[in-house]
Amino acid sequence: LYPGLTVAILFAAEFFMLAQAIRYTSASHTVVLLYTAPIFVALGLHWKLPSERLSKIQWSGILIAFVGIVTTFIGRENLLEQGLSQVLWGDLLALLAGIMWALTTISLRLSKLNEAHPTQTLFYQLLGGFVFLFPLAFLLGQAEIHWTYIAIGSLVFHTLIMSFMSLMLWFWLLRNYLAS
């Protein structure tokens, strides 16, 4: 139960931070910073699993990735237009969402959930997301839904493709391949 609760909380925290990040910074910043998760997974598992030790070339790759991320954010004029502190807050939230995703992945790899069927892990994450995020939507005044055909289609797509199929594939990959 503890590993399931851990991944549920981390999953909910990731999506909460992601949703908040988009309120303060651009979607492009959010996506780039969210997808730092594999870097943090490689770093985290390097210290926890002997089979995931990073080689010198992999360390070089991580350094290049970090330098690339920093380089893409340097010298952007739109930061001043949007308000630097607001954008930086959103960027921090997006980076924290990436770290939460990485911690979720690391928790999956290090716990008994690594041996569980992917549907069980998916259940923990989606149930946890619902239990923690549903009340937060009301507390933050973000619970109003404007039902349109596009909204319904998007909900169906994200439920079936993004939440089910892609996460099932992700869990299968985690069980069958090293993160590094």
Predicted regions and their residues:
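Short alpha-helical transmembrane interface motifs in multi-pass membrane proteins
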Residues: 2-3, 29, 57-61, 88-93, ...
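Hydrophobic/aromatic residues within transmembrane alpha-helices
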Residues: 21, 47-50, 54, 111, ...
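Hydrophobic transmembrane alpha-helices of multi-pass small-molecule transport proteins
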Residues: 36, 43-44, 54-77, 133
